């Protein structure tokens, strides 16, 4: 393969660029004579900062603009935080590669006056910042004595708001903090028993044209099979529930002895109703595991909970 040029579409946020530059570096290191360039842009989710993500109600908030660049031939691939990539992609595009996963857990970040507390010991009335309905519902279920407020902006902006005293603590993805060099600000990794993470959290998804065999061959070098198996199960679970990135659906997955165990959760917005179950299956059929787990939760009332949430979104 000689003198092949590859263009990446990326969000222009600092975290997105760190992730995209990592992909660029890995590809150029492993494939001789490959020239990789980056087209950075703002997405709808980057531009609308004064409205809670759930109220915007669009499943492609952080991806549509990047996908448009590929569909018109201006980019060959798009690098996404996999948790932001909808489970149903536009015609002509596919998820071509899933990279090795960073820690998928949520993390507690506190300001100096609260560094003696863990999430479970925060005083009544403490103000917790999060933009995620998934985190909000689970934490309301566990800690109804805390006050939860929406927080928008990139990771750095959110930490600045925390340190300025607007919040006592904030919840962020551990992976993003580590990739941006803020690992020292992680006060607590939140156990999955308290908060299941988002579908695909911690992994990068590389999207490309479905029929571009050369590009698929190039990006396959970054594929991590165990991560891919786990994330495909998680995404099948979300797809079967017809949920999106902004609804209270959480997961956890692990692989042991050629078996994949997937735990899933659906909760009401107030956290009062929370359904959780798990399904174990053949590691080589991850999507079936996700579908079966979704069926289990539907039988326990997940569809009713999600229907109520979607109805509230429509009213707004």
UniProtKB/Swiss-Prot annotation:
SUPFAM superfamilies with a match to the protein in the record: Periplasmic binding protein-like II (SSF53850), Porphobilinogen deaminase (hydroxymethylbilane synthase), C-terminal domain (SSF54782)
Coiled coil: none
MF terms (GO), sorted A to Z: hydroxymethylbilane synthase activity
A Gene Ontology BP annotation from the UniProt entry: protoporphyrinogen IX biosynthetic process
Necessary cofactors: dipyrromethane
Cofactor binding: number and manner: Binds 1 dipyrromethane group covalently.
Catalysis performed (reactions): 4 porphobilinogen + H2O = hydroxymethylbilane + 4 NH4(+)
Entries under PANTHER family matching the protein: PORPHOBILINOGEN DEAMINASE
Function: Tetrapolymerization of the monopyrrole PBG into the hydroxymethylbilane pre-uroporphyrinogen in several discrete steps.
Family, as annotated: Belongs to the HMBS family.
Protein name per the record: Porphobilinogen deaminase
Organism of origin: Prochlorococcus marinus (strain MIT 9301)
């Amino acid at each position: 393969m000689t003198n092949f040029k590859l263009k990446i579409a990326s969000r222009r946020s600092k975290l997105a660029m760190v992730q995209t530059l990592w992909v660029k570096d890995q590809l150029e290191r492993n494939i001789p004579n490959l020239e990789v360039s980056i087209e950075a842009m703002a997405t709808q989710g980057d531009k609308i900062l004064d409205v809670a993500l759930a109220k915007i109600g669009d499943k492609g908030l952080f991806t549509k603009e990047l996908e448009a660049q590929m569909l018109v031939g201006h980019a060959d691939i798009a690098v996404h935080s996999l948790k932001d990539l909808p489970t149903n992609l536009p015609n002509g595009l596919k998820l071509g590669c899933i990279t090795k996963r960073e820690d998928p857990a949520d993390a507690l970040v506190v300001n100096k006056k609260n560094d003696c507390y863990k999430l479970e010991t925060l005083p009544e009335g403490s103000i917790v910042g999060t933009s995620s309905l998934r985190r909000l519902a689970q934490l309301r279920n566990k800690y109804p004595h805390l006050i939860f407020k929406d927080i928008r902006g990139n990771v750095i902006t959110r930490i600045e708001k925390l340190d300025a005293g607007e919040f006592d603590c904030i919840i962020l993805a551990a992976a993003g903090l580590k990739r941006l060099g803020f690992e020292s600000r992680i006060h607590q990794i939140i156990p999955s028993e308290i908060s299941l993470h988002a579908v695909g959290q911690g992994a990068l998804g590389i999207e490309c044209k479905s029929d571009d065999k050369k590009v698929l061959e190039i990006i396959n070098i970054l594929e991590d099979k165990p991560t891919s198996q786990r994330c495909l199960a998680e995404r099948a679970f979300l797809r079967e529930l017809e949920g999106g990135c902004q609804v209270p659906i959480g997961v956890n997955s692990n692989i042991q002895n050629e078996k994949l165990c997937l735990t899933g959760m659906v909760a009401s917005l107030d956290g009062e109703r929370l359904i959780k179950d798990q399904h174990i299956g053949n590691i080589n059929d991850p999507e079936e595991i996700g579908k079966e787990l979704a069926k289990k939760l539907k039988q326990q009332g997940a569809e009713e909970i999600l229907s109520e949430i979607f109805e509230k979104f429509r009213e707004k």
